[in-house]
């Protein structure tokens, strides 16, 4: 236990939730500085409660600390109240475990999960008193390394990072740290370390690449500036999930966080191939963990944390081949210990409903469907393997089982979307409500009514998806679509049973710009940050007018990045990365979308996406 605190009692008493900053949580790792060689600070650039809920941080934290020569600590974005105090009193950002300044570490690793956290990256660097621009850092600064899904287009933030780790973090940190130690022994400086790091698999060092542009703003070329540095960086991948590291002693916070439970990752990847979904492409191929190992992990983590709930983590839990066996085991063991089980990402069918009725309070819980589009035509465009018949059958089974609350998730603005598709959202919501009244006798209806919560987000095209070439709607178009949805719901027979929620259009448009932007956007990020923008993912701190001012000041048009269809022969900012899925496959899927043609999932038939080259997972298993 570390008794030192970077913040005085006076400051801790002034701020919201001081437990965010004092460390010493259950299973936090403290090491003797005299016995380690490398100090690594792992950062999630958002508030503590969100960062502490992220499984990837827990995996890397546990893995790095399993090595005797490394001490990995954590840091999160200070909330706005402490941010103001730290600036006023010149308190440098500190790591939780040692309470030492982050600027004194060897590495600062930042996981980047969401584009709207980009300004928080600048906040972290600024509060840590590390120069924002990588080119301005000297040998006394930490190596700033970024990872996570947003690094599959790292260009908008390339100027702020020394290294991007492309792919899954379990494979290359050991070679990177060994290289760092070797360079330190040889007394070579930062530049030479980065030059050597750029030759490691999965490492992208932006300073050794340059971009040229056409007069119209599109990319003319992107190439390395030195010999021996690869023009293409291939993602890192864990080929055997069963043997890969998993944290048996995850850190347990003192305050309630977003995901306050044991998280058991049962598999990585998804077989479904939804054309809008970036995760479904990035994490190919699907790789399962052995069910016996998962049983052991579950019991060990529950024992080591004292958590009262366990959740299965996967993009599509229903596709895990040993799910019935695993759930039977967990139900038996967790019932003995009065542990709750959370089962997200399940398809709603008879098996799932039977399981959920045993592990949830039916009267209090709600069922979730994600049709994503209102019509079957548009669901075929996006390759969402879910028919209206399946949704209504699942709803009927659920209502028979006692459920009275249903959540529906849709996206507005998919490519080729029409007014008829949008009206389909209201019509499907109404049909589900009607199914309740047709299925449940009047005397058995709780409060006499079903609750349908229909939510729409706005479509954001992402790199390495078949829709990476698609235009995004403007803010005005998005708002018009949301109003049309609301009006159509109000016209339904069962409209009193339907509640409608929709997302902020400004944020979705900006997310789209940052998701498919190039290196020139770094000047926009610097502009808005210096104007006071951070925590842009939080609506109360998002200032769209400042962002629009920044684009104008920097001579950049946000519509160039979002509101145009990109030709197939255009060089995209992320084309130098190899995510395992081929460009030819994405082009085929883009054409299939335009033709309203579906593709079978990976278990039904291989679509030749390119992931088979990794020689693991679903790609080497028999299909049927």
Label each residue range with its predicted role.
Residues 1-30, 34, 40-42, 491-624:
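Radical SAM enzyme core and accessory elements
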Residues 11-41, 48-49, 206, 213-263, ...:
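N-terminal [4Fe-4S]-dependent radical SAM core
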Residues 40-46, 64, 251-278, 302, ...:
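N-terminal pre-triad scaffold of radical SAM enzymes
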Residues 42-43, 116, 300-407, 411-453, ...:
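Conserved SAM/AdoMet-binding glycine-rich loop
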Residues 48-51, 80-83, 116-118, 151-154, ...:
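Flexible loop/turn segments at secondary-structure boundaries
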Residues 54, 256-292, 608-623:
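Canonical Radical SAM [4Fe-4S] cluster-binding loop centered on the CxxxCxxC motif
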Residues 69-81:
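A short beta-strand-loop structural module common to alpha/beta enzyme folds
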Residues 78-223, 466-518, 525-540:
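Glycine-rich beta-alpha loop elements in corrinoid/cobalamin-binding modules
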């Amino acid at each position: 236990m570390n008794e030192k605190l970077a913040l005085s009692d006076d400051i801790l008493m002034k701020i919201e939730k001081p437990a965010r900053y004092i460390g010493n949580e259950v299973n936090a790792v403290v090491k003797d500085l005299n016995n380690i060689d490398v100090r690594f600070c792992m950062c999630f650039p958002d508030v503590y409660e969100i960062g502490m809920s992220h499984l990837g941080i827990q995996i890397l934290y546990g893995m790095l600390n399993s090595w005797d020569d490394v001490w990995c600590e954590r840091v999160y974005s200070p909330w706005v109240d402490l941010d103001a105090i730290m600036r006023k009193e010149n308190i440098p950002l500190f790591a939780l475990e040692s309470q030492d300044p982050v600027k004194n570490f060897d590495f600062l690793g930042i996981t980047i999960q969401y584009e709207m956290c980009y300004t928080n990256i600048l906040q972290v660097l600024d509060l840590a008193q590390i120069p924002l621009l990588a080119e301005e850092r000297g040998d006394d600064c930490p190596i700033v390394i970024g990872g996570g899904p947003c690094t599959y287009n790292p260009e908008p933030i390339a100027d702020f990072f020394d290294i991007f780790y492309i792919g899954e973090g379990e494979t290359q940190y050991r070679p990177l740290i060994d290289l760092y130690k070797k360079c330190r022994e040889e007394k070579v400086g930062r530049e030479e370390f980065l030059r050597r790091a750029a030759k490691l698999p999965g490492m992208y060092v932006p300073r050794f690449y340059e971009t040229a542009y056409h007069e119209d703003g599109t990319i003319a070329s992107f190439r390395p500036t030195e010999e021996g540095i690869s023009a293409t960086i291939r993602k890192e991948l864990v080929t055997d999930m069963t043997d890969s590291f998993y944290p048996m002693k995850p850190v347990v916070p003192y305050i309630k966080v977003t995901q306050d439970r044991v998280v058991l990752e049962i598999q990585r990847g998804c077989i479904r191939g939804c054309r809008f979904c970036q995760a479904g492409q990035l994490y190919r191929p699907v790789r399962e963990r052995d069910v016996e190992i998962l049983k052991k992990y579950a019991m060990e983590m529950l024992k080591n944390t004292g958590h009262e709930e366990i959740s299965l983590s996967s993009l599509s839990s229903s596709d895990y081949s040993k799910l019935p066996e695993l759930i039977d085991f967990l139900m038996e063991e967790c019932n003995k210990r009065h542990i709750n089980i959370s089962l997200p990402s399940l398809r709603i069918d008879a098996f799932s409903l039977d399981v959920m009725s045993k592990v949830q309070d039916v009267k209090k819980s709600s069922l979730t469907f994600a049709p994503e589009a209102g019509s079957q035509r548009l669901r075929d465009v996006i390759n969402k393997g879910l028919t209206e018949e399946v949704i209504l059958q699942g709803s009927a089974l659920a209502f028979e089982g006692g459920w009275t609350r249903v959540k529906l998730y849709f996206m507005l603005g998919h490519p080729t979307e029409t007014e008829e598709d949008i009206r389909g959202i209201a019509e499907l919501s109404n049909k589900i409500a009607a199914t309740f009244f047709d299925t449940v006798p009047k005397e058995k209806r709780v409060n006499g009514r079903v609750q349908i919560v229909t939510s729409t987000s706005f479509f954001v095209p992402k790199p390495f998806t078949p829709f990476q070439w698609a235009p995004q709607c403007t803010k005005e178009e998005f708002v018009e679509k949301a109003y049309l949805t609301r009006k159509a719901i109000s016209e339904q027979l069962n409209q009193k049973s339907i509640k409608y929620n929709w997302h902020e259009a400004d944020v979705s448009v900006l997310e789209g710009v940052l998701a498919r932007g190039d290196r020139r956007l770094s000047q926009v990020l610097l502009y808005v940050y210096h104007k006071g923008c951070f925590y842009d993912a939080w609506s109360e701190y998002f200032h769209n007018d400042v962002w629009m001012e920044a684009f104008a000041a920097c001579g950049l048009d946000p519509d160039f990045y979002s509101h145009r269809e990109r030709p197939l022969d255009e060089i995209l900012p992320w084309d130098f990365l190899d995510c395992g899925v081929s460009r030819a496959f994405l082009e085929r899927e883009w054409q299939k979308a335009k033709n309203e043609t579906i593709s079978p999932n990976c278990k039904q038939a291989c679509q030749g996406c390119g992931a088979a080259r990794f020689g693991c997972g679903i790609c080497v298993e028999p299909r049927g």
